[in-house]
Amino acid sequence: MAEETLLTDDFLRQLMNIGEVDIVVGLSTHNNAKTIGPVVAAIQAGILKCFPRERAAIINVDGGSQDGTAELVTQASIDDLWRASKVYALRTLHSISVRYARTPDPSLALRMIFAAADLLRAKACVLIAPDSTTIDPDWLQRLVKPIYTDNFDLVCPIYHRQKFEGALMRNLLYPMTRSIYGSRIREPYATDFAASGRVATDFLGNGISELDWGRMGPEISVTIMAVTGKYRVCQALVGAKAHASRNSQDMVAVMRRTVGALFSSLDSNFAVWSAISGSEAIPIVGTEIAVAPENARVNRKRMLEMFATGVAELEPVLRSILSASVLAELQRIASLGIEEFEYPAELWTKTVFEFAASYHQSIINRDHIIQAMVPLYRGRSLTFLTENRDGPEENIEMRDESLCADFERLKPYLLEIWAERK
């Protein structure tokens, strides 16, 4: 059994009362009372509808919620679903909750869920974000079925996003992960995914979670482990993805968890990614699900202002991170008006690669490097919004592919500057 120390006596007792299962659905929560009820109901309905013969358990690991989240998970009644759907499970659906800390620790939470799946000998372990407000019961089937029927080890989602959603994924996480690790996974940092029992067990035993990038970005670390370890990976079309509104715009924290984890992963995986050229398609299962378009209102002038202010105020920091030519070009476009402004794809790609190399070399404090990247990302996001505001979604896909091609084409530039000292 992997990582026995993750299982407290109380947690272990609850798991032993369940016995072996086929499917574990993990929920890592922290003050999610406003959304957790519908999420649990959708999970229960998905198990009833799609896996009535399978033994299943919902396992909630809670990071110190003060709003009754854990109680809502364990008290969720499946009786109402039985009566409404007229579909009955042929096995008991278990639901347990354990508090692991007073503050959230996503890396520890993931390891605890995987340790539970390992102990229960689950064939599939599904992770669902507790604030996924658009989840429907069919998500379970779309994520789990490829593991059951086609022996895949990791199923990553492909979300149908509104036009201007997922800018960080489209402009940085996807193209860079694709160019670095050579796999076209559209959502490398997904909070909803399914892993085989093999992946869960191996993740616990390979020490990734003890590395900086494993602690910062546990979800993307599972993806990277899978693509570098030659596990069988596919992608499932799950439909729309939306989160409950957040106090969100702490973009520094978001980028630290995502971009910081990706940059950090390059250190320990250099021998792997430095030998990769181009990228390979990853199988996609399921059918596209239509989603009604929504009009998003964005303050473009404010975005330009944040970009220009960041370039000006952070000049000494940027000078230590970026080449003189890239910094000069950023200063030039920062002086442009809203109608003339453009942050070209090639300039953005070089910017990202120079930040990655400086992060590797720890030119300055790594957190400060990520913070300095935030206003530049806002500038690139402004160009993304401007380019796509009037066109159809097909144009966005074409531009996404073009940006990925730039990242792949310029990867030798990253290798060239990787070991240089500024």
Predicted regions span which residues?
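N-proximal low-complexity "stem/linker" segments adjacent to membrane-targeting elements
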Residues: M1-A45, S402, P412, A419-K422
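Cell-envelope/extracellular polymer assembly enzymes that use nucleotide-activated donors
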Residues: D22-V24, A57, S221
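A conserved acidic beta->alpha catalytic loop
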Residues: D62-E71
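Active-site-proximal specificity loops/subdomain of glycosyltransferases
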Residues: Q75-L120
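Conserved catalytic loops of nucleotide-sugar-dependent glycosyltransferases that act on lipid-linked
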Residues: D105, E165-S264
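Short beta-strand-to-loop acidic/aromatic patch adjacent to the donor-nucleotide binding site
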Residues: I113, A117, R121-T133
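Conserved donor-nucleotide/metal-binding helix-loop-beta segment in metal-dependent transferases, i.e.
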Residues: I135-I158
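Terminal low-complexity segments of carbohydrate-biosynthetic enzymes
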Residues: V259-K422
